[in-house]
Amino acid sequence: MQPTNERNFDMSTLEKPLHIDIPVKLAEVKIAFSVPALAFEGDLPACVFHLQLIENDIADWNAKAQVIAVFHTNAGHVTLNNNAYNTERNVATGNPYKVLVSDLMKRGVHFELCGATAKVHNWGNEDVLPGIKINTDAIARLTQLVQEGFVKISE
């Protein structure tokens, strides 16, 4: 490999061994993701990366799973269809997250939008992507899920 001034983030070029000290394998997974705002890993929302990661784990474990992602506050726009997204974000590009959301839904993740967030932004049911459910409000829904035995992950 030739020396360069550019940083190389291609992890596959690193030949360092990695020993997992605490291997995890679960038979059942019940997770509720609370997503009030987007934090990014590069250009990918961290919550999407984490949802992909746990879905990969669930598949590897062949685990029984319920994964629910509740979008609210400053992240509700992730659940919008192209027209509503364009209006909300003052862009003409459409929702850049729709394919990621659709892929995760196909893998079993349930997406919900906070009803209180929708009301504040004047979004109706016709404004969300297909398959998105609208709950009463995020706090009530997350409380319900925790009381039902879900582990709450705060993004």
Residues covered by each model-derived region:
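Secreted/extracellular ectodomain signature
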Residues: M1-E155
